[in-house]
Regions:
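Glycine-/small-residue-enriched transmembrane alpha-helix faces in small-molecule transporters
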Residues: 1-22, 132-159, 179-184
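Specific transmembrane alpha-helical segments of multi-pass solute transporters/efflux pumps
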Residues: 1-5, 33-85, 121
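Juxtamembrane C-cap of transmembrane helices in multi-pass membrane transport proteins
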Residues: 3-15, 27, 66-76, 84, ...
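Hydrophobic/aromatic residues within transmembrane alpha-helices
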Residues: 11, 20, 24, 72, ...
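C-terminal transmembrane-helix exit sites in multi-pass transporters
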Residues: 31-40, 88-113, 117
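Hydrophobic transmembrane alpha-helices of multi-pass small-molecule transport proteins
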Residues: 32, 104-126, 147, 175, ...
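Loop-to-transmembrane alpha-helix entry segments
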Residues: 45-52, 82-85, 101-121, 136-137
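Residue-level signature of transmembrane alpha-helical cores of multipass secondary-active transporters
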Residues: 54-58, 70, 82, 112, ...
């Protein structure tokens, strides 16, 4: 993901953020589709049965987590993006506990706090002044949204079983992610550029 955050800041001078995310997933779909076409054809009924789960996973993990870091990169720093996105594992633990009504054990709370401290220590290089001098922007809200999307995607990807193997599922979610992003691409293209 770190390289993705750097791309979010670097490539945006040439390619708008939603266009970048949409084309990225469309290219992935086009590369993988020839290899899974026949098996997906045979599993059309499974696709129909799993459509909303695949749609949710595509919306969170592919569209949301694919586009929001790029949108964020327009108005925030890679450092801020890294700090906020590094909170994803903590969000996964907390959201999973909330969604599945599980009580966190004492050691899990300790692990969350320890990882939060560790991430903060590394990013701020152990210097409190680095933390105090942070400036936040709207881009930080977008990357926070991406971290939440990634967390939800991770939780449900593990817990939702599928009739599709990993490559078939990846290909279908790449297509759905692209399709979800197309309206936002059109808005970006015609209203903002």
């Amino acid at each position: 993901m770190t390289s993705n955050l750097a791309i979010a800041r670097g490539a945006l001078d040439n390619i708008p953020p939603v266009a970048l995310a949409c084309s990225r997933w469309l290219i992935v779909f086009l590369i993988f589709f020839p290899f899974v076409y026949q098996t997906i054809q045979k599993k059309r009924k499974d696709f129909k049965n799993e459509f909303w789960k695949l749609f949710f996973l595509s919306a969170t993990g592919y569209a949301g987590c694919g586009a929001l870091p790029y949108v964020s990169g327009l108005t925030t720093t890679v450092t801020n993006m890294s700090i906020i996105y590094a909170l994803s594992p903590i969000f996964i633990v907390l959201l999973s506990a909330y969604i599945y009504k599980e009580r966190l054990k004492y050691l899990q709370y300790c692990a969350v706090l320890l990882s939060l401290f560790g991430v903060s220590f590394i990013i701020f290089k152990g210097n409190l002044n680095n933390f105090l001098n942070l400036n936040f922007s709207i881009g930080d809200v977008w990357i926070f949204g991406a971290a939440i999307c990634w967390s939800l995607f991770s939780i449900f990807l593990i817990n939702w079983k599928s009739k599709f193997n990993i490559i078939e599922r990846f290909t279908l979610m790449s297509l759905l992610g692209s399709l979800i992003l197309i309206p936002f691409f059109l808005i970006e293209h015609f209203l903002f550029l």
